[in-house]
């Protein structure tokens, strides 16, 4: 029998979704569920309406209350004499979809209800969570026990999600023959199963699927002349510029195609009851070039591919508007260019939008992405209706690979709420064998219901409860990953990236390996339990990292006095955990987009068991002049008046010819250098660029990036041999004439890796010029002993409240102004140059800041100035704005150009005009020899 007392009163001081309720006046009796193993209440279930759903909710409540109290709760249709009543499914008028309502009416009556049977079920789970139950994973729940369970007499709670559709493409939520899975998806309040059942609510279909040419007007039926000559209609599909037909896009002007499409949609509405219909393309963004579609495109001032999509959507919507007035039709905006002007392309009242935001850094909040304007904001002008999102939350290269994005869900969902999103479908780690996959699933489900929930508290609670004896190590692992992600601001975590060495150092890998060994040793002493199963699962990504980076670990481990086990032992442990039936192996590579289990193991076995090393005899720097840069078709070698060569990239047209999508094409306006044997190894990478735009300013007029070639790619996964690991956007301005040097950070290059510059495509750009790419040896750049070229924390002074700290992992010193210190007068961090540092040099500052406003171009400011004297005030020599984003807190190396440094000159880092900051940090200042870069005048204003 339970022997712990669990009295719950705290909820009466909580806030509901719509406000707060009165405090207990002290003389009312609480509602008592059970005491000393005896039920004090019976559950009365509603029998009208969706009776099966209400009874399911009542049975769930009875089951969990029984587990908590040891009592047996009756589920009946009428109140029972001598027992209080818990009414499940009372008649209720909900204000919002999926709303729940819980209210203690008296000491004898508690009502749990909501929006239909589903809202009632959510009310049951909400109450159980209030009592401390946690539904973490399909095979792990936390259920507290008590001798007496009661609820305050004035307890009232009303809550509702901001999203109507909440779906994850995850094995623990999909229908796969395991009845536990569907039950679990309800506890996480996911709505995917509502497409298949109406026991709880009306069938609810999320209208953002890729269905055109696959499900509707299927190419298998209408574009396969060999198999189906009788139904062959190539004219129904988009005509390409070369005369071929696109199997992924429909012709938006063919009347016969529309008749077929109308018939197929009508059947689904009538026979399946669908109320939301997707008209999303099949992973495509091509345009049709037939005469009819050319007229549609000509009506669009942007001349992009969006007008044809809108024309198709609106025609379908108009056709069904009177016949099926309650049905909504959506297109899936997947890189399509928004037609202009918005007034000409407004959507029909029964038409809507959904977005697939693929091209972005998925380890930073979505609001940080500079393409949000063209990908989302511009399109929102076409409709006043809520929109839907196809989201991404993992690496498609390998689900087991560490992927540092667990802390961005709340920020993302708050942004989605702000722009009016009411539905989400996310491709997260499909298998529980992913990188702490179930933690990601849990955070996703909690935060897409309530974006304002404390994600840090949710994370810590989950880790401590689920991983139990190894919770400390798991939290340390998350912190290592967060720190590694923030080492360099411009690291880019795309969803196809597979190169962990672009952000995790060899030392990081050894630290994580040590955590995993501690976890393994501790678990040996633990008896079999759900916690142990999940703790072993948590080791999977750590073991994958050790196997895939074993050569790097061999180089770092001796310096850290760590002895590594044989690689084969680690791979075998990984295989055993991966193939354990409890870890859902069959659901790993669900779409062929990720490594399958065996390919992961082969990949690890392919890694050499010899320590990686830097090439011997690396020079201090390698400068690649414009004359040495190769690249795409639209580039031209030109010269300045003084003869300095540069490459001019022609950014017009922005869209890729024949496709209409706005994306950067390496075969067009691109230049760069592909690493050969001479450029292998680790370098700080710089590019000197200038960009001119029609607008006064443009945040992403050009990009400096890195495609990292992976040397151990297997034949099983050659689709993505290059990882895009840096994507640094470069601002431009009208009539820009000055060169600016940009640093993407420090990266290890393999042969065939490519450093590149491309034109931006978000808004029109006049020109992008590239003068050079420079590779600087870290031994030169980070030489703290060279007082002539390196100014560290010892040369910095801070305004009131500033503190000098030591980095917890990399052990460098830096100065910080926290949020409180930034409220003082004139907050700043100032480096003063010495006599020894007097020279002509290219000046760089390594800084970071915590912006609160997305895409803040002027979050901080660096100013180089002469010292003030009795006779002269300080004179600004150069200055530069420092940009920032929320949760984009990485260190960045910022150029102030080639300058003449004199003793006593100062470099000041201060807040800019971009809004409130959470912190402001200065780590070091670097003075590089001018001969590394061509000419003078790089950077500062």
Whereabouts are the PLM-identified features?
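Extracellular carbohydrate recognition and processing domains
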Residues: 714-752, 872-902
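Short beta-strand-plus-loop segments that form exposed binding edges in beta-rich domains
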Residues: 758-765, 909-917
